[in-house]
Amino acid sequence: MYFNFVKEQSEVAKMKIGFVGAGRVGSTIAFTCLQQLDVEEIALVDIMENLAIGEAMDLAHAAAGLGKYPEIVGGSDYSILEGSDIVVVTAGSARKPGMSRLDLAMKNAGIIKDVARKIMESSPESKILVITNPVDLMTYVMWKESGKSRNEVFGMGNMLDSMRLKRTLHELGVKNINKAWILGEHGDSMFISRTLIDAENVPELEKVLSEVRFVAAEVIKRKGATFYGPAIAAYRMINAVLNNTKEEMPASVILKGEFGFSDVSVGVPAIIGKNGVEKIVEYPLDPQDMENLRNSVKLLKERLKELGY
Ligand SMILES: NC(=O)c1ccc[n+]([C@@H]2O[C@H](COP(=O)([O-])OP(=O)(O)OC[C@H]3O[C@@H](n4cnc5c(N)ncnc54)[C@H](O)[C@@H]3O)[C@@H](O)[C@H]2O)c1
Ligand SMILES: O=C(O)C[C@H](O)C(=O)O
């Protein structure tokens, strides 16, 4: 019995997280996952090879302080991603103060197209979590260019927006915030789902929405970038895949008829598990929510056309 137990244990799949992009967000996500998850392997790819190697070395030292000794490698060669359960993509440019996320679209689409091809050459079985902005457009580009099934490619945007919404509601004295989701574009057309909000004494939401929509720019103006909030949001999604939690959360996912829309990636409620997007949850959204979602889809499709999709 003991031998069988050991044998079974040795067959337990190793949890490996790959990263393409070892910059502020990628490295902070890796640092977060190192602390929160029992990951056996982390691989960080970046065009700045020394950055990726340096981050891997620093992360390995941090792990030792936690009594953890995962294999952590960095470099510019995509072959180190082989066997990743999930690849987290933050490769690309970040916006500067005064820019919108959409201003990054043309440049980052070219990067994501190349990254998609290289991920499929090195780790074709991985789920892909896209973070690079504008994330809804980059998730679509990743899906199209990788050729993967739509459940295996998804983006993190509204998860972060929803965390910001919860904080803003808390500061306004809202209690028992069971569900407070931002849906739609991870951008200026994002909206608070009034259909799905579940909390006590919810205030008028117009001002709250404006705060959430533009708070990232305020952070960027002061510290140059956002990465702690994004890292926790990304960790929540990575954890759902690696531990098959089947947690329901807002995610940028490829629609094929859901909510009446197709051929676009946009933030909607989804169940995330070992298969990636396990299910898109088609709640009967009220007319205002549907109008807002339609507005996001229209904007995103116009920008996809500009990118040649
Ligand atoms: N979806 C979200 O909620 C969210 C949150 C925060 C940041 N972001 C986005 O994530 C991206 C990264 O942000 P950051 O602050 O980490 O930027 P950063 O500049 O610190 O890191 C980006 C990294 O990508 C690397 N890179 C560039 N082109 C590459 C390529 N072709 N292959 C591999 N690596 C490449 C760069 O060398 C750099 O290290 C930006 O687009 C930013 O807007 C999205
Ligand atoms: O706003 C940005 O440019 C980064 C990210 O999308 C965020 O919302 O923090």
Feature roles, as predicted:
Residues 65-126:
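Rossmann-like NAD(P)-binding element
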